[in-house]
């Protein structure tokens, strides 16, 4: 740790405490993520270390840079680029109103970051406003990319805060174990709706069942016809048959018709029908200047 000076605590992350730090040589401000390792563990699994070291190669302006991996017996510290705030805090400062040009800019940057990582076969798996960081220039960056694969997604953060289900797709809620890039596209859709509504979450479920109910009340309950194989997923439960809503303008009133079209292409229950990040970036919502 000699290379970095620890400054004040920024907060609690999913995997441990986050501190503001300073590179003693360059004086650059960084974020130090102390990954809490299990007491009875053998230290850091070599597979996790390999995964983490691969992430140092992910260099893109919409991805939070991982500069360094500091590893000692019981401690693993990840040194990241520092950003001023996360999207959750940004929402809190909005007082319920967002400029739709900002909504569009953030969404495009989110998709660019996702497309880059997906092209390198790296999934996020736990996208939410808390790990989308924003700097003073209005640049949005994705944080904690690839960490879910290295460490797993805990059910509770070690600070005992429950990991949110609000951005999880129905296939994962039903116990699907084969993750593809589509998991991140669902989360991106939830975040898009939240952006368009100035920080009000689209599906704020209290538990897995409530989460599924909130989703299906909007999108309709899936069947074997609409989603072949859904009833064979390990945690599948039969739920009341809700029809899909017809008017998305009630769900996201501020979003233009093209924006609503993009949202509907992201929020598809059947994973292989969700649009990819690359495809979503080409959507007319981003090219039509009259779009707000």
Swiss-Prot record:
Belongs to the protein kinase superfamily. CMGC Ser/Thr protein kinase family. CDC2/CDKX subfamily. It catalyses: L-seryl-[protein] + ATP = O-phospho-L-seryl-[protein] + ADP + H(+); L-threonyl-[protein] + ATP = O-phospho-L-threonyl-[protein] + ADP + H(+). PANTHER family: CELL DIVISION PROTEIN KINASE, CYCLIN-DEPENDENT KINASE 5. The modification Phosphothreonine is found at residue 14. Keywords: ATP-binding, Cell cycle, Cell division, Kinase, Nucleotide-binding, Phosphoprotein, Serine/threonine-protein kinase, Transferase. It comes from Glossina morsitans morsitans (Savannah tsetse fly). This is Cyclin-dependent kinase 5 homolog. PROSITE patterns: PROTEIN_KINASE_ATP, PROTEIN_KINASE_DOM, PROTEIN_KINASE_ST. Its EC number is 2.7.11.22. It comes from the Eukaryota.
